[in-house]
Curated annotation (Swiss-Prot):
Region (Disordered): 580-607
This protein's encoding gene: dnaK
Record PTM Phosphothreonine, positions in chain: T173
Known function: Acts as a chaperone.
Feature: compositional bias, Low complexity: 580-591
Taxonomic path: Bacteria, Bacillati, Bacillota, Bacilli, Lactobacillales
Protein name, entry field: Chaperone protein DnaK
Skewed-composition ranges (Acidic residues): 598-607
Pfam families the record matches: HSP70
GO MF terms held by the record: ATP binding; ATP hydrolysis activity; ATP-dependent protein folding chaperone; heat shock protein binding; protein folding chaperone; unfolded protein binding
Highest taxon above the source species: Bacteria
Induction per the UniProt record: By stress conditions e.g. heat shock.
Family designation: Belongs to the heat shock protein 70 family.
Length: 607
């Protein structure tokens, strides 16, 4: 069975891993980095992903960041003169990860396990799966990020029973999961979180502070200047990271804008104490889900054996201190917070292929599911933290006499009134026979698969007529849209491949011209003019093709030059070898001649 790669599709950074033997290994990107910025930019019709895209974010307005925060919504982003869905942008990141994983493995990759925040709802999970499909990946499993982290942490501890709390604060989302580990079973007891809390919010606090201070000093509002704001974003992210290791950092942004008197510069010192003060409310927000998860799991703090930190934002000292204060435990730092999720996803891939044995993953649904009933009430069918996959049925009836149809309004959330929860979808069961209210028996069945994706069925028990839908929110894509996007993605991949081949050819041509000119110069007056002339003629032909910018001609002329240059190099080598041989022969003769001069006459006296 072909390899299943594990992908952590993050808000700020993404990573890809693969199982090698029994070890999960992070695959470095072409720049040698183990994580890849989740950034996409467009330039001259070219799609740029990762480090290169992030580097040009300041100067290129067609740059998209933090697209994960829009997954599951109908919001689109404008770039490159077009509108893109979050699924399409995410697919570009996935395609890039897939591409360099294939380069590393030396084979095509078609299957992946992709992670999502535990608190992602159905629409967000479906959007992630669609993004994988657009990127040419069969998504074998959607796994919750804290669960994947627990897999990576606990794979070598299957003989030990323990309860762990995974605290996962990433670039844009926050999750807390509590798991019980033992005998190879990873049982998620509860999960809680906040999809609107992450490292980006900590960056924003610094940005807001810098904008306010600059306005106070110079009377200019930088928040209206897009390029200045991107520079501030980069500086804020760097300052946040610096303050994890030092207590003070200097923010220096020369020529940030211009005033009446000329250019203005931003120079500011940010202390860790000030940063902690600015972000105090964000740190406080992390405490509520911790308490919620413990309560839902029915556990006290003393029953938690280990606290695992996941996500780059858990390096913030104030966050670490808050975790210690809230749990009463020193966090376990045995895993790399940036890499552990992708590694866990690769392990789940190994479980699917059978390469990892005796491991069972029991995950849960993060939010309750149900339907709207009379009076706008939200009636739950499946409670949050129910182990998945699962199925649950309940019988309902009509609200009016002779009601010919029922509307099924499917919701996800925890609030008692339907209007306050997230609508997943609506459908109708029609042709109900005329009868007094309360008589028809309508059975509603919810199914949640192992990926946390919901399907709902309504059945009239009297007529046996039924209606089923796989939930598709208003942000969902139709099969036709996904097919079109897949074709676009394939075309882009083909265009990228051609562009790379073109760059490689131009580099080869430059290298061949340089090397041949050097060889022709070195062989001047060495007695093989015919070969030199042939190489020179081929060189001139290649230069002409290069000037004409004819790629096919360049390829043909490069092959011809390589052949002629090789003939010249052979002659040069033969001449050098003959000279070497002659020199060695002369040295041998000299040594033999000198041997006679070393004979000394001596007298022998007999005693």
């Amino acid at each position: 069975m072909s390899k299943i790669i594990g992908i952590d599709l993050g808000t700020t950074n993404s990573a890809v891993a693969v199982l090698e033997g029994t070890e999960s290994k992070i695959i470095a990107n072409p720049e040698g980095n183990r994580t890849t910025p989740s950034v996409v930019s467009f330039k001259n019709g070219e799609i740029i992903v990762g480090d290169a895209a992030k580097r040009q974010a300041v100067t290129n307005p067609d740059t998209v960041i933090s697209i994960k925060s829009k997954m599951g919504t109908s919001e689109k982003v404008s770039a490159n003169g077009k509108e893109y869905t979050p699924q399409e942008i995410s697919a570009m990141i996935l395609q890039y990860l897939k591409g360099y994983a294939e380069d590393y493995l030396g084979e095509k990759v078609t299957k992946a396990v992709i992670t999502v925040p535990a608190y992602f709802n159905d629409a967000q999970r479906q959007a992630t799966k669609d993004a994988g499909k657009i990127a040419g990946l069969e998504v074998e499993r959607i796994v919750n990020e804290p669960t994947a982290a627990a897999l990576a942490y606990g794979l070598d501890k299957t003989d030990k029973e323990e309860k762990i709390l995974v605290f996962d604060l990433g670039g844009g989302t926050f999750d807390v999961s509590i798991l019980e580990l033992g005998d190879g079973v990873f049982d998620v007891l509860s999960t809680a979180g906040d999809n609107k809390l992450g490292g980006d919010d900590f960056d924003q606090k610094i940005i807001d502070h810098l904008v306010a201070e600059f306005k106070k000093e110079n009377g200019i509002d930088l928040s209206t200047d897009k390029m200045a704001m991107q520079r501030l974003k980069d500086a804020a992210e760097k300052a946040k990271k610096d303050l994890s290791g030092v207590t003070s950092t200097q923010i220096s942004l020369p020529f940030i804008t211009a005033g009446e008197a000329g250019p203005l510069h931003l120079e500011m010192t940010l202390t860790r104490a000030k940063f902690d003060d600015l972000t105090r409310d964000l740190v406080e927000r992390t405490k509520v889900p911790v308490r919620q998860a413990l309560s839902d799991a029915g556990l006290s703090l003393s029953e938690i054996d280990e606290v695992i930190l996941v996500g780059g934002s858990t390096r913030i000292p104030a966050v670490v201190e808050a975790v210690k204060a809230e749990t009463g435990k020193e966090p376990n730092k045995s895993v790399n917070p940036d890499e552990v999720v992708a590694m866990g996803a690769a392990i789940q891939g190994g479980v699917i292929t059978g390469d990892v044995k005796d491991v069972v993953l029991l995950d849960v649904t993060p939010l309750s599911l149900g339907i709207e009933t009379m009076g706008g009430v939200f009636t739950k069918l499946i409670d949050r933290n129910t182990t998945i996959p699962t199925s649950k049925s309940q019988v309902f009836s009509t609200a009016a006499d002779n009601q010919p149809a029922v509307d099924i309004h499917v919701l996800q959330g925890e609030r008692p009134m339907a209007a306050d929860n997230k609508t997943l979808g609506r459908f109708q069961l029609t042709d109900i026979p005329a009868a007094p209210r309360g008589i028809p028996q309508i059975e509603v069945t919810f199914d949640i698969d192992k990926n946390g994706i919901v399907s709902v069925k309504a059945k009239d028990l009297g007529t046996q007529k039924e209606q089923t839908i796989v939930i598709q929110s208003n942000s969902g894509l139709t099969d036709e849209e996904i097919d079109r996007m897949m074709k676009d993605a394939e075309a882009n991949a083909e265009a990228d491949k051609k562009r790379k081949e073109e760059v490689d050819l131009r580099n080869e041509v430059d290298q061949a011209i340089f090397a041949t000119e050097k060889t022709i110069k070195e062989t001047e007056g060495k007695g093989f003019d015919a070969e030199r002339d042939a190489a020179q003629a081929a060189l001139d032909d290649l230069k002409k093709a290069q000037e004409d910018n004819n790629l096919d001609d360049m390829k043909a002329k490069l092959e011809a030059l390589n052949e002629k240059a090789q003939g010249l190099a052979v002659k040069l080598y033969e001449q050098a070898a003959a000279a070497q041989q002659a020199q060695e022969g002369a040295e041998g003769a000299q040594a033999t001649g000198n041997a006679g001069d070393d004979v000394v006459d001596g007298e022998f006296t007999e005693k």
